[in-house]
Every structure is written in C-alpha cells, then in structure tokens.
From Swiss-Prot:
This is Probable protein kinase UbiB. It comes from Serratia proteamaculans (strain 568). Its main location: membrane. The keyword Nucleus does not apply. Residues 123-501 form the Protein kinase domain. GO terms for molecular function: ATP binding; protein kinase activity. Is probably a protein kinase regulator of UbiI activity which is involved in aerobic coenzyme Q (ubiquinone) biosynthesis. The gene is ubiB. It comes from the Bacteria.
Length: 543
C-alpha cells in the first residue's frame, strides 16, 4: 500500500471505531490479534454509544465523504443483506456536498468543449445551481437560440478519489468473510465491483445523455411524464447540456396542495409511469428519489411529472417482464404454487428446487401480509419477501431485479406520501392484466408476424433452393446411416467369428497341453500349434 492509502485507511479505521462500528463483528470472530489491536487503539473510543447501530453507520459514512455516502445509498437498496433498522438508516443518507469553485467549473467546461465558453453559451452563472458528490450544475443560455439550459459538469478531482477509495474497499471486502458470520453470503467483492461499475457509469455523462434522450422519446407527448431535452451537440464525457426546467419538488407537499394539485391523480400517475417504463418500454429510470422528480406548475388539475438525472437506468428482458407480471398476479391471487413454479421456470432458482418446499416457504412468509387491507400492502415489500425467500433456495442475485425493487420502493413511498389512501394494487392490476393479454393473445401473434415479415420476405426467394439443399442433405445423411449400419453388421459378424476362433483355439491349446503329459509327442504339438493359429486369426479379425 502507498503512504497515501495507509493514511486513508487509518482515517477510515479511526472513523469506524469512533462510531463503534466494531460492534458489527461478532465476539466469536474477534481473534486474539484483533482484540489486542483494539485495546492498543484505546485513544479511539466509541464516542456515540448512545445512538443505535444503524444511525452510527450512517453518520460514519457521511463523515467519510461522497464516495462512501453513495456506497451507503446503494447498499440501502440491498435489503436482502441488512436488517431493516440498518437499511432504513442508509436510505437517509444525503448526497449533498459543498460546490467547487465556479471558475474551476468554467475552466473544466472550456477544456472539455475545446474553446472559450462564450463560443457556445451566454449568461453562464458561476454560482452552482445544485451540487452533489459526482457533479454540479450551472445555468446558462444557448448562444444560437437563447434557450435556458443547465450544464452538468463532473468534479475535476473526483476520479482519483474514487479510484483510491474503491481500491481500499476491495481490501476491506477481503476481510468481511473472515469477520462476519454472513460474510460469504454478502459476497462483498461482488458488491464493491457492482458499486465501482455504477460509479464509473455516472462519470460518463454521454451515457446519461443517451439515457435521457431514450426516456424522452418513450414519453414524447405523454401527459404523465416530461423529460427535458438534451442538446447532444454540446455534450461531452464530462459535460452534459440540457433544457432548464421549472417545477415543484415532488417532496414539497405543502406547495403542491397550495397549488391545488390533484394529489390522487398525481400519485396514481407515478405508479402508471413506473409500470409503463418497466413493461411497455423495458427501460426504467432507476434513481427516482424525490430529488430527481419535480411536478410541473402548469395544469395542477392534470399534473405532470418532470424527471431529471438519468445516470442510472434499468431494463428487463422479455422473459423477466413476463415472469414478474405473472408473479405479481399470482401473489395477489394467493396462488403460491404458481409463484414457486414461475421462479423455477424463469431460472431465478435452480431447476432441481423442490417446488413443494418452495411453495410452503413462500406461503409461510407471504400469507401474513394479507392480514392487512389490500390498499396497505406494499408492492416493494412483496417483492423483497419473495426474493429473500428465494435466496434461501439459492436464488442468484439478479442486478436488474434489485434495481427494479429499489425503484418500486421509491415510487410506492412517494405515491403514499402524496396520497396516503393510494391503492397500488388497484392502480397496477388493470395495467398488468392488459399487458399479459397483449403478450399472449392475438395481438401478440400479429405483432410477431409483423416483426418477422421482413425476414421471411428476404428468405422467400431462397426457399426452393433451401428445400432442395435440405432434400440433398437428407439423402446424404441416409446414405451415411446405411453405410454405418452395414459397417456395424460386418463388425458384429467379425466379432462372432473371432469368438468362435478364440473358443476353438482355447480348446486345442488345452487338449494339446493335456496330451503332452502322456507318451504321445508329435500329435499334441500339432494341436497346440493349431490353437495358436486360431488365436492369431481371431485377433486379426477383431482388428
């Protein structure tokens, strides 16, 4: 380790110990060297013993800085790995840091654009509009049209910080299986690898621009969701330029109510937007926390969401969507056998899983949920319970489903914050059932024919030739089979003859040997010689 890494590791250890996070390690895992080491660090006592463990973990991550804050935010979505009291605290982590100097932002933008800022923009505001751990946002106007825009620029110093902290995370991850009872199940190195990929994706703003363009296209003209326009000609890997929007933060309930917003419709549209993204488009915004969602000032009686920050998106393939929709419908129909079979058929759990045992486990965990009124049942917790039960039956972690679960929890929490009486199932069920009918009915057949029509139109002129080639190949195959059959029959005949000759040879050898013990001298020698000849001929037949 470099001196810089050693200093950073010392700081991490000091912060962890000052918040008493050594309590995460069970006493039975504290070996003698660890106990001695902890006592030697007596000047690092737990200074927050009055606070619960989950809160202490959150405060420690906040003190360690933006990379660790984002790591905690990601881990808050992995409720299969942590008890609720810790996961709930991690969701409270705020990705807010002081902005860096606007003059430095201007210099970084000019470096990325390859010229003076005034070439493309007017009225650039060096005071940041918003600031987070990875990037910050400034306002300006396009020189050509006067359109108000925002420029999102990556922090110049963030890459080396991320690389250094991620390297330390890998080193610490190697110790987790040794120190924690569930260490192997947590798969710490995979968790760090997933986090590293997420961070690197967020550092490439061209990826975010492409995501925003796709999402905007999917909801073009929709009254439910508006996505600001991206000006891709001005975008670079470290700079994103998009339309500036004005809206009410979705978490600002008093302002929404004062505006006269139809809160019931707004909450229901949040659910509809989510299921439309997942099942219609197979492309969903996976970072839909309140800081990224606004509500348009226009038409409060017919409210429209505004979505920003498309750095993290998820997608489901056709099979995942179908299995997920069928799982939801089967669960709310309390058909646990169907739920178990769907998990096996989808490959989410191994094929050799005992379906009866799996069904019983799902029933045991999920049946108590129906003690509540249907309107109070949490979709996100349903999904969480299903996945946690499935993991006991060796379900592999599905990254796309983890993202989906996280987003669903966001959407559900947001919807009930806006309108506490929101019945998520009543809102979602018609959509899911309609989507399922569309997938298996006549429209699905017609759609499949349309999709395949260009392929068959291209192949149609070739069909006679393909048919002739197929007949020729069948003929050649039949000839090969006949030849092989004849060879096998000839081989069986030779094997039969060989066995006969071996038997005759053995008889002659035994007879000659017996007669040699008598007074006859020449005749037995001939018998033995004949036996040897029979053996040689039989051996030749076999080869």
């Amino acid at each position: 380790m470099t001196p810089g890494e050693l200093r950073r590791l010392y700081l991490i250890v000091r912060v962890f110990l000052s918040y008493g996070l050594d309590e995460l390690i069970p006493q039975m895992r504290l070996t003698l060297p660890l106990r001695v080491g902890r006592r030697l660090l007596f000047w690092m006592p737990n200074r927050h013993a009055d606070k619960p463990l989950g809160e202490r973990l959150r405060l420690a991550l906040q003190e360690l800085g933006p990379v660790w804050i984002k790591f905690g935010q990601m881990m808050s979505t992995r409720r299969d790995l942590f008890p609720p009291q810790i996961a709930d605290q991690l969701t409270l982590l705020q990705d807010r840091v002081a902005p860096f100097d606007g003059a430095l932002a201007r210099k970084h933008i000019e470096l990325a654009m390859g010229g003076p800022l005034e070439t493309w923009f007017d009225d650039f505001d060096q005071q940041a509009l918003a600031s987070a751990s990875i990037a910050q946002v400034h306002t300006a106007r396009l020189k050509t049209t006067g359109q108000e825009v925002v420029l999102k620029v990556i922090r110049p110093d963030i890459r080396p910080i991320i690389k250094a902290d991620v390297r330390l995370m890998y080193r610490l991850a190697a110790w987790v299986p040794k120190l924690m009872p569930d260490g192997r199940r947590l798969r710490p190195r995979e968790v760090v690898r997933e986090y590293e990929k997420t961070l690197l994706d967020e550092l490439n703003l061209l990826r975010e621009a492409a995501n925003a363009i796709q999402l905007r296209r999917n909801f073009d003209g929709s009254p439910m969701l508006y996505v600001p326009e991206v000006y891709s000609d001005y975008c670079r890997e470290s700079v994103l330029v998009m339309e500036r929007i004005y809206g009410i933060p979705v978490s600002d309930i008093p302002t929404l109510e004062k505006q006269g917003t139809n809160m019931k419709l707004l909450a229901e549209r949040g659910v509809q937007v989510f299921f439309t993204q997942v099942f219609r488009d197979s492309f969903f915004h996976a970072d839909m926390h309140p800081g990224n969602i606004f509500v348009s000032y226009e038409h409060p009686e017919d409210p429209c969401y505004i979505g920003i920050d498309c750095g993290i998106v998820g997608s489901l393939n056709k099979d995942d969507k179908r299995y997920l929709a069928e799982n939801f419908i089967a669960f709310f129909n309390r058909d646990y056998r169907k739920v178990a079979e769907l998990h096996v058929d989808s490959g989410w759990v191994p094929r050799d899983t005992n379906v009866e045992d799996f069904e019983f486990a799902i029933r045991t965990v999920c049946e108590p949920i129906f003690e509540k009124p249907l309107s109070e049942i949490s979709f996100g917790n349903v999904l969480l319970n299903l996945f946690n039960t499935a993991r006991r039956f060796n379900m592999e972690v599905q990254p796309q489903l983890v993202l989906l679960q996280k987003t669903l929890l966001y959407v559900e929490g947001l919807g009930r914050q806006l309108y506490p009486q929101l019945d998520l199932w009543t809102t979602a069920k018609p959509f899911l059932e309609s989507w399922m009918r569309d997938q298996v009915g006549i429209p699905a057949v017609i759609r499949a024919l349309k999709e395949k029509a260009p392929f068959w139109a291209e192949k149609l002129p070739e069909l006679p030739e393909l048919f002739y080639d197929s007949l020729q190949q069948h003929k050649l195959l039949q000839q090969s089979v006949d030849k092989l059959t004849n060879q096998m029959q000839a081989q069986r005949v030779r094997q039969g003859q060989s066995r006969y000759l071996f038997g005759v040879g053995a008889t002659l050898l035994v007879s000659g040997t017996i007669l040699l013990s008598g007074d006859v001298e020449v005749f037995p020698a001939w018998l033995i010689a004949a036996g040897i000849v029979s053996w040689v001929i039989g051996w030749k037949r076999t080869t």
